[in-house]
């Protein structure tokens, strides 16, 4: 199990990303817009750099919903490999069966 502080930190990052998403998209659009003046583009770059680091979606980490494990997480289920295996063995995941050949 991940520490509570790590889970809370990730939740805080998700909220920060959601809060700044619209403004970041506008600034990025201004930066790549070739019709904008160089001064406007530079101002957009500076404004983007002044935003918090955690406002970037690249800083988010997929974590298991049950344990908070950061590695071995299946996106489709939102579970870590261990929890997914346990859920599959209990029959909690419809259509998922253990392979045998």
Curated annotation (Swiss-Prot):
Q: Which UniProt keywords apply?
A: Ribonucleoprotein, Ribosomal protein, RNA-binding, rRNA-binding
Which GO terms of the cellular component aspect does the record hold? cytoplasm; small ribosomal subunit
One family name in Pfam for this protein: Ribosomal_S14
Q: Which GO terms describe its molecular function?
A: rRNA binding; structural constituent of ribosome
Statement: the UniProt record of this protein carries the keyword Electron transport: no
Q: Does the keyword RNA-binding apply?
A: yes
Q: Coiled-coil annotation: which residues? A: none
- Which region is the signal sequence? none
A Gene Ontology biological process noted in the UniProt record is: translation
State the source organism's domain of life: Bacteria
- InterPro entries xrefs: Ribosomal_uS14, Ribosomal_uS14_bac/plastid
Instruction: Quote the subunit structure annotation.
Output: Part of the 30S ribosomal subunit. Contacts proteins S3 and S10.
Q: Which family does it belong to?
A: Belongs to the universal ribosomal protein uS14 family.
Q: What does this protein do?
A: Binds 16S rRNA, required for the assembly of 30S particles and may also be responsible for determining the conformation of the 16S rRNA at the A site.
The identity of this protein, by name, is Small ribosomal subunit protein uS14
User: Which organism was this protein described from?
Assistant: Pseudomonas putida (strain W619)
Source organism lineage? Bacteria, Pseudomonadati, Pseudomonadota, Gammaproteobacteria, Pseudomonadales
